[in-house]
Amino acid sequence: MFKHLNALFIGLALFACTSGAVAQTIKPIETPVPVRPAGQKDVVGLTTPKLDVVRVGFIGLGMRGPGAVERFTHIPGTQIVALCDLIPERVAGAQKILTKANLPEAASYSGSEDAWKKLCERKDIDLVYIATDWKHHAQMAIYAMEHGKHVAIEVPSAMTLDEIWALINTSEKTRKHCMQLENCVYDFFELTTLNMAQQGVFGEVLHTEGAYIHNLEDFWPYYWNNWRMDYNQNHRGDVYATHGMGPACQLLDIHRGDKMNYLVSMDTKAVNGPAYIKKTTGKEVKDFQNGDQTSTLIRTEKGKTILIQHNVMTPRPYSRMYQVVGADGYASKYPIEEYCMRPTQIASNDVPNHEKLNAHGSVPADVKKALMDKYKHPIHKELEETAKKVGGHGGMDYIMDYRLVYCLRNGLPLDMDVYDLAEWCCMADLTKLSIENSSAPVAIPDFTRGAWNKVKGYRHAFAK
């Protein structure tokens, strides 16, 4: 009898422990949210006076800067006023781009680590376009806004929460646009799929996925002074999340009716980073910080989820892992572009072979083409042909720059604001915090400080 009683007591104790564990609520780790200074307002939907001509100064002419200069020579209503890089030869190379386009040379700034400040201080520049290494992005943008300039900053625009809040406060205080140059939101498949989602083709969007999966083994030597490998060596977490986050967040109307509440993240151990350093320098690295693979799961206020991955170390085909999971349909870009949806989501006369649509298989190629044609985004209808001629990651870079100029010239809200920048860049600090606390949930701040529901749904602005 006592045996049975002991077994019963043990069972009840285990049940009580298990029940207690299930009932426990783990409070996410929180980071400080600075109080908005008195008299300062949010910049959700910010508009500024129209600019007949957008006068531009470029800082950083290494890997991405020259391509931006080239693209701007094809954008109407722009004037390239100044060029800056630490290395004089790079400025000279960018001047040749202007000469080839039959444009006058721009003012040159180089040879000093503070030369960029003089560019920002000029009175004849409206927009400062920053394409330097990551660690200089935020400080340059803040200085430029403080001197009355709009700023466009390469990805990632900020690497820490302190930098993010400084950019937000400066944009709010100066009422200047602060846009991150996230090109992947203009990809042809992504933008068409966004249009489909906005028109209800997938039903309610419940889950999105994105990533930056790109083996950089052949590219590490091209980064000036090895800055990118050094950054991965010294920083843990998803340090380059914006290519995946941008399209994912636009699909879910983040800070335009929904907001991200918390994340959990984990990584693998570091293998290929230290191996690469050993191979190229002979040095042993025992404390390489960034794991080869980082995976992050996010939950929003409205119960949606986002999965983000980062991997620049292992052999894998390039992928941004773009996926859309809706209540009534699905889209995926990698490894192949495909759609899946209930037949009821599409009118029978809109696509061929409508009878072949089902909820468990990819639509046939002719149906996919019909969908891509029917839901081609208005931006692509206007710019696709020119974008593919000018180029820049297949044309999406040109569309990004064109839209930036278009909105400034028409006094419209930009396609991406400083809060988008914050939400996509905060992954670096917040994923590290989660990983270093055994993948604990970490709260994602409301960077709008209360304005996340002010606009209902993400949309691009167009002049009337």
UniProtKB/Swiss-Prot annotation:
Gene3D superfamilies: Dihydrodipicolinate Reductase, domain 2 (3.30.360.10), NAD(P)-binding Rossmann-like Domain (3.40.50.720). Binds 1 NAD(+) per subunit. The NAD(+) cannot dissociate. It is found in: Cell membrane. GO terms for cellular component: plasma membrane. A lipid is attached at C17 (N-palmitoyl cysteine). Its EC number is 3.2.1.-. Residues 1-16 form the signal peptide. The keyword Lipoprotein applies. The keyword Oxidoreductase does not apply. InterPro entries: Gfo/Idh/MocA-like_OxRdtase_N, Gfo/Idh/MocA_oxidrdct_glycsds, Glyco_hydro_109_C, NAD(P)-bd_dom_sf. A lipid is attached at C17 (S-diacylglycerol cysteine). It comes from the Bacteria. Its main location: membrane. It is a lipid-anchor. One of its GO terms (molecular function) is hydrolase activity, acting on glycosyl bonds. NAD(+) binds at M63, R64, D85, W134, K135, H136, H137, E154, V155, N183, Y240. Substrate binds at Y212, R228, Y240, A241, T242, H243, Y318. Its cofactor is NAD(+). Keywords: Cell membrane, Glycosidase, Hydrolase, Lipoprotein, Membrane, NAD, Palmitate, Signal. Glycosidase. Belongs to the Gfo/Idh/MocA family. Glycosyl hydrolase 109 subfamily. This is Glycosyl hydrolase family 109 protein 1. It comes from Bacteroides fragilis (strain YCH46).
